[in-house]
């Protein structure tokens, strides 16, 4: 087990993912508690454990500081009543129906070794299913168009998208004379024609579902790409089609009732999503 874990080099999986790989590749079935103990004894901490340990140590340090302040002064200060920044905005409650809200984002990460690319991703807020993914060199209109096409093809028309305030969603008009660069007109027009509302937010907690998904993907996907010797965007986009099915089976399926509406036929979608050239 230790040799297997070491074989991943610097790109090591978290303990739960490692247990899945052990069962799949070596036919070794141990609980994550047992494997975690073996790794600890050998001096290994999983990436997830390191983050959890840092949070615990940070909380312990804060507690000690508060205790020291209490001993030094009986009068409360303003800092005693300040809320932690990450708690100032409560998390958004999960929606009830599939298609009611789709959260979208793009994650820049070295998915293939040292090469940084952007993974455009969309997750259904109610079910937790990934409904669209696409790799591109940058966060692009083209990337989100591919994600939208995947949603329309497999699921249908959702009620609303939730995104951050990126240029591709909120920029009303560019100074360029190229219609191609008027990104809001491009994506916003397509959504308007389909009857999809777009909401934007700069608050991470508001789109916590897709933020957490990005963290999970960054932990798992690079290892699976490496295992399958995938080193290019085109290879990765083909691989993602079957990878998503396995991911959703394991982590999604939290809602069954749907409000997705029937999407236009492929020919109509192609016309609607066609990018306007010069």
Enumerate the language-model features and the residues they cover.
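Positively charged, polyanion-binding regions of nucleic-acid-associated proteins
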Residues: 1-10
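Short, charged, surface-exposed loops that flank catalytic or proteolytic processing sites
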Residues: 12-14, 105, 224-240
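DNA-recognition alpha helix
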Residues: 14-28
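Mobile-element integrase/transposase regions
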Residues: 28, 40, 45-129, 140-159, ...
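Short coil turns linking two alpha-helices in DNA-binding domains
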Residues: 31-34
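C-terminal, beta-rich DNA-binding module of retroviral/retroelements integrases
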Residues: 78-83, 244-278
């Amino acid at each position: 087990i230790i040799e297997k874990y070491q074989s991943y080099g610097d790109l090591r999986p978290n303990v739960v993912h490692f247990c899945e790989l052990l069962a799949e590749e070596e036919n070794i079935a141990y609980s994550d508690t047992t494997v975690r103990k073996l790794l600890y004894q050998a001096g290994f901490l999983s990436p997830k454990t390191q983050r959890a340990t840092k949070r615990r140590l940070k909380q312990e340090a804060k507690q000690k500081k508060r205790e020291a302040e209490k001993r030094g002064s009986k009068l409360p200060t303003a800092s005693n009543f300040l809320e932690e920044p990450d708690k100032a905005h409560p998390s958004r409650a999960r929606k009830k129906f599939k298609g009611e809200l789709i959260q979208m984002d793009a994650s820049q990460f070295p998915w293939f070794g040292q090469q940084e690319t952007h993974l455009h991703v969309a997750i259904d807020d109610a079910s937790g299913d990934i409904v669209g993914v696409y790799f591109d060199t940058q966060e692009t209109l083209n990337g989100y168009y591919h994600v939208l096409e995947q949603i329309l093809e497999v699921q249908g028309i959702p009620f609303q998208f939730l995104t951050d305030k990126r240029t591709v969603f909120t920029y009303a008009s560019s100074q360029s004379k190229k219609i191609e660069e008027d990104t809001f007109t491009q994506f916003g027009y397509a959504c308007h024609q389909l009857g999809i509302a777009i909401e934007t937010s700069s608050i991470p907690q508001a789109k916590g579902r897709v933020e957490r998904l990005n963290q999970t993907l960054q932990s798992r996907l690079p290892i699976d790409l490496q295992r399958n010797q995938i080193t290019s965007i085109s290879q990765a986009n083909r691989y993602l089609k079957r990878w998503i099915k396995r991911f959703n089976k394991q982590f999604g399926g939290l809602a069954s009732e749907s409000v997705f509406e029937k999407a236009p036929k492929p020919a109509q979608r192609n016309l609607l999503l066609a990018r306007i050239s010069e």
